[in-house]
Regions:
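Hydrophobic alpha-helical segments that form the core
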Residues: 77-96, 109-117
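Hydrophobic alpha-helical connector segments
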Residues: 1-32, 39, 49-53
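Short acidic/histidine-centered micro-motifs embedded in hydrophobic/aromatic stretches
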Residues: 32-39, 110-114
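Short, hydrophobic secondary-structure boundary micro-motifs
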Residues: 31-33, 74-75
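C-terminal peripheral helix-coil segments that are non-catalytic and often amphipathic
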Residues: 60, 98-152
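Acidic/His metal-coordination segments adjacent to aromatic residues that form catalytic metal sites
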Residues: 1-5, 65-75
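Amphipathic alpha-helical packing segments from all-alpha helical-bundle domains
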Residues: 44-70, 79-91
């Protein structure tokens, strides 16, 4: 599907739905895994040094999503967007872990709504009036990532 689609919103929606549907068979065990992964010293922690290969693979998926989209994305945001989308997807997974609705309906609804918001925010990011806000936000992301790298 992604090979044929160049619309950012459609691409992100497809990836996020696929991520959750792939995890769905493990939903009953997700809480137990989360307890381990939430430990900052656990090798299963998604931010841990030991998790770097898995994290990089996931970020690469988002790199492809961003690279092959027709959306107008400022260059400095385009460089950071795969990492930001990875963080976003981690938040969605955390929500899904706690979602007790039938067939994770609340999670899918959250994905639909947040992908819509992200698409609009990314469109707004190209506006010259948003440049100072965009620069400030990306500087913060860079600083946080530098701290993360220093700790691993």
């Amino acid at each position: 599907m992604l090979e044929r689609e160049s619309n950012f919103k459609a691409r992100l929606l497809a990836v996020m739905r696929l991520k959750i549907s792939t995890l769905e068979p493990y939903h009953e065990f997700a809480g137990v895994l989360f307890k381990t992964a939430a430990d900052p010293h656990s090798p299963l922690n998604p931010f841990a040094h030991d998790s770097a290969p898995v994290r990089r693979d996931s970020i690469r998926l988002f790199e492809g999503l961003v690279r092959d989209t027709k959306a107008r994305i400022p260059d400095e945001l385009r460089a950071e967007l795969p990492y930001l989308l990875w963080l976003y997807h981690m938040g969605i997974i955390l929500f899904w872990i706690h979602d007790s609705s039938a067939k994770s309906a609340r999670t899918y609804r959250l994905i639909e709504q947040t992908v819509e918001l992200l698409d609009k925010l990314i469109s707004l990011a190209s506006n010259p009036l948003m440049r100072p806000v965009r620069k400030r936000a990306l500087k913060l992301v860079s600083e946080l990532r530098d701290l993360e790298l220093a700790e691993t």
